[in-house]
Amino acid sequence: MVSLLAFTSCASEYKIEGSSSVSRLDGKMLFVKVPSGDRMLSIDSAEVIHGMFKMEGITDSTSMASLYMDDESIMPFVIEKGKISISIDNARIVVTGTPLNDRLYDFVGKKTSLDDRAYELERQESRMIMDGKAPDEIQREITREREKLAAEMNALAKEFIQKNYDNVLGPGVFIMLCSNFQIGRASCRE
């Protein structure tokens, strides 16, 4: 009895409430998976019904997790004590409601903005070529802008990882960035 009380006092309840406007998710099973050695272990699941899903459980520690549909990772988030709200649409995914998820998705928003600027830079290069600008002028301008964006991205990532070295976000985001995991982009498009 004492050991049961000791276990429950260390455990924390989490509750996930999600909504999705992506119609192809209706009727699908979503799984919460956490790293376990060299594989991902499913710890919870729910069916998406009319764009809504709910999960709840007990975790013994705060950990990085991913929401999966079949074998496809849709998004990262943090399993921690509290109510976690997940919103999925065709353009983006947002997780809020708990301190670390709020912090993670603030970072995701900033990173997405930089990614959008990098995409626009590629379009700008194409427009410059179509406008007949000199190739060396295009190269200089685009290279300068790419280097500026890369420096901003590196500064953003470095600051985030340093500020979160003492929790699961620092190492979790570091690993995701090093493995080119697409953070924040909807990967469940129709």
Regions found by a protein language model. Name each.
Residues 183-190:
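Residue-level detector of conserved catalytic or cofactor/ligand-binding positions
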Residues 153, 169-170, 185:
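N-terminal alpha-helical segment
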Residues 178-181:
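Short coil/turn linking the two alpha-helices of tandem helical-hairpin repeats
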Residues 166-176:
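Amphipathic alpha-helical repeat scaffolds of TPR domains
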Residues 1-8:
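Sec-dependent bacterial lipoprotein signal peptides
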Residues 10-154:
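A non-transmembrane, solvent-exposed segment enriched in polar/low-complexity residues
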